[in-house]
Swiss-Prot record:
The lineage of its organism: Bacteria, Pseudomonadati, Pseudomonadota, Gammaproteobacteria, Enterobacterales. Its EC number is 1.5.1.42. Belongs to the non-flavoprotein flavin reductase family. RutF subfamily. Keywords: Flavoprotein, FMN, NAD, Oxidoreductase. This is FMN reductase (NADH) RutF. One of its GO terms (biological process) is uracil catabolic process. It catalyses: FMNH2 + NAD(+) = FMN + NADH + 2 H(+). Coiled coil: none annotated. PANTHER family: FLAVIN REDUCTASE (PTHR30466), FMN REDUCTASE (NADH) RUTF (PTHR30466:SF1). It comes from Klebsiella variicola (strain At-22). Pfam families: Flavin_Reduct. One of its GO terms (molecular function) is FMN reductase (NADH) activity. Catalyzes the reduction of FMN to FMNH2 which is used to reduce pyrimidine by RutA via the Rut pathway. Transmembrane segments: none annotated.
Amino acid sequence: MELADKASFRDAMAHVGAAVNIITTDGPAGRAGFTASAVCSVTDTPPTLLVCLNRSASVWPVFSEHHTLCVNTLAAGQEALSTLFGGKTAMDERFAAADWQTGATGCPRLEAALVSFDCRIDQRVSVGTHDILFCHVVAITRHPEPRGLMWFDRGYHTLMRPAC
């Protein structure tokens, strides 16, 4: 057993696989997006997700002003887009790299996402370095792509949907 310091916690979390998502928003403060794996279901009544966003992230000021977002869960083959949205690239360049539609909330919805959850942000809670956004899902768009994209052991991996 080891003490849970920052480094050991990060190393341990590398062993926990997660879907890769691009979180987007648009509104008075502008259009923004970032890559996130810290996204999960909270409840289905009402349908709610949580999204974690570091307050030191360049996109935080935009998301802090908006009340809607879209969680775009990536499919296999979208690693480059994930990397682009996870870096310091200008927003216009990030969004120019893929095809987007406007979702039910007005947020950018990735056309080729495995699934997109259009959300209204109902609550924000600050914990440590991050804000936790509780997001009420108002619309869902699914893509028939059978392969998901996962982040595990500090790398991308493809997950196949089982054949029926």
